[in-house]
Amino acid sequence: MNKFLIIDGLNLVRRIYAAIPNENDMESLKERVTSACTKLLRVHHPSHIAIVWDGDEISWRKQLYPDYKKGRKPMPEPLAQGLRALQEHLATLNIASIYAAAEADDVIATLAVKTAKAQGEAIIVSTDKGFSQLNHPRITQWDHFNQQYLDIAALEQKLGVDRSQFLDLMALAGDSGNKIPGIAGIGPKSAAELLKTFRTLSTLFSSLPNLGAKQAKKLAEGKEMARLSYKLAQLQTDLPLNINLKDFRANSTPHPAPNIEQ
């Protein structure tokens, strides 16, 4: 059975970079990223490995909602300048890169789902809780920095909803980190309570007459924003990747990195 280790490139590298005392010390970054990748290979013993990078194009989410991820700090200039050299170094270690046109998350999600559907195992290396929506027994998420798999039970307890309700929660309460709006006046706690009662968005919106007038009004007025927020939070899992799995075998010969259109 194939075991595909899929690394969220900037999620890993930016956290490692943030821990380096001298922001211009790209040699230390290279050493630490190399060490991290070596450890990932040693811990997981994958048959295949890829590291997926965000691209420079404006994402379809940003086009749909211009405030998406608004206000995020840009990549530090030394890291931006040294990133290509780091990617080339990883290629010499037979860790193949995939370059997304815009956001890496959709490419990672597509890779993971395709692997799982082909009866393989996908391990996503990332701390991004958004991947928890990929609810499949052959898809897991590894937190390299805490050296543990994502604890779904703990996440569900923290969010107050089941994993299967993650997108409905984002639709109602939004996500401040990504500037996904949700419905004005509906916070995470009240959203979780509503989903505990009604289970799904569709059931909730068809049950507005059963709610108090004030809350029903908020939900009715925010219905379209909830739909937008759901779409922004939902990962694409069916991108045309046009890649050959054999090019990503662990310890295989380096090859040109593909660019994925989105």
Swiss-Prot record:
EC number, UniProt record: 3.1.-.-
Molecular function terms, GO-annotated: 5'-3' exonuclease activity; 5'-flap endonuclease activity; DNA binding; magnesium ion binding; potassium ion binding
Keywords: DNA-binding, Endonuclease, Hydrolase, Magnesium, Metal-binding, Nuclease, Potassium
Residues that bind K(+): 172-173, 181, 183, 186
Domain of life, source organism: Bacteria
Keyword Hydrolase among record annotations: yes
Residues covered by region (Interaction with DNA): 185-190
Domain 5'-3' exonuclease: 164-251
Broad class of enzyme this protein falls into: hydrolase
GO BP of this protein: DNA replication, Okazaki fragment processing
SMART domains, per the entry: 53EXOc, HhH2
Cofactor: binding comment: Binds 2 Mg(2+) per subunit. Only one magnesium ion has a direct interaction with the protein, the other interactions are indirect.
Binding site for Mg(2+): 105
Co-factor requirement: Mg(2+); K(+)
The protein's role, per its UniProt record: Has flap endonuclease activity. During DNA replication, flap endonucleases cleave the 5'-overhanging flap structure that is generated by displacement synthesis when DNA polymerase encounters the 5'-end of a downstream Okazaki fragment.
Family: Belongs to the Xni family.
The protein's name in its UniProt record: Flap endonuclease Xni
Gene: xni
